[in-house]
Structure formats: C-alpha cells, structure tokens
UniProtKB/Swiss-Prot annotation:
PROSITE patterns, per database record: RIBOSOMAL_L24 (PS01108)
Domain of life: Bacteria
NCBIfam families: rplX_bact (TIGR01079)
Family, as annotated: Belongs to the universal ribosomal protein uL24 family.
Species: Thermobifida fusca (strain YX)
Name recorded for this polypeptide: Large ribosomal subunit protein uL24
CDD domains assigned to the protein according to its UniProt record, in alphabetical order: KOW_RPL26
PANTHER family reported in the protein's UniProt record: MITOCHONDRIAL RIBOSOMAL PROTEIN L24
GO molecular function: rRNA binding; structural constituent of ribosome
Swiss-Prot/TrEMBL keywords: Ribonucleoprotein, Ribosomal protein, RNA-binding, rRNA-binding
One GO cellular component term: ribonucleoprotein complex
InterPro entries documented for this protein: KOW (IPR005824), Rib_uL2_dom2 (IPR014722), Ribosomal_uL24 (IPR003256), Ribosomal_uL24_CS (IPR005825), Ribosomal_uL24_KOW (IPR041988), Translation_prot_SH3-like_sf (IPR008991)
Length: 101
C-alpha cells in the first residue's frame, strides 16, 4: 500500500471530498486508512451498571478506502511511485515532481 501512517492526504471521493488530514493508522490487509477528522461516525456506547459508567454517543473516525485518498505534496494531490536507489533501497517518490517522499 502506497499510503503510510503519518502521511498528509486529501480525500478525492465520497462525502468528505476535499478534506485533508494526517493518516492515523493504515490497514493494509483491508486496503483502508484512518484519517484524522475525516469520515466521522457516531457510535452508541452501552452503559455499564457494575462500573457505574453511563451510556454515551462517541464520535469516531471510520476507515476510508485507500483509493479515495491522495497524498498531498506542497498542498496539491500527487500519485506515489517507487524507485530504487544506487545502494538498492526502495524509496517512495512523488509522481508529480519526481522527488523522494
């Protein structure tokens, strides 16, 4: 998966189109990412009688498919590619500028 934890991304499709945020968590097996402040859902939490905890409604960030986000570079969306350095290490590059990410 080309998007990693800590990357700054923009949502390019869906109800939050145009929103930007940092990737909090990448889920490569599911091809999804969790982005800060994007795709917010409300989850009802059950009350716990034994612990004395009240029921509440919690707002959480739901995972969004990786095809619906693009990496941001200098405020503009870009695609990600890979190159090998002279020493053989694989690095991510920006398809827009060709620079190493």
């Amino acid at each position: 998966m080309k998007i990693k934890k800590g990357d700054e991304v923009i949502v390019i499709a869906g109800k939050d189109k145009g929103a930007t945020g940092k990737v909090k968590k990448a889920l490569p097996k599911e091809q999804r990412v969790i982005v800060e402040g994007v795709n917010l859902i409300k989850k009802h939490k059950k009350a716990n009688q034994a612990g004395g905890q009240q029921g509440e409604v919690v707002t959480l960030e739901a995972p969004i498919h990786v095809s619906n986000v693009a990496l941001l570079e200098d405020g503009r969306p870009t695609r990600v590619g890979y190159r090998f350095k002279e020493d053989g290490t694989k690095v991510r590059i920006s398809r827009r500028t060709g620079k190493e990410i």
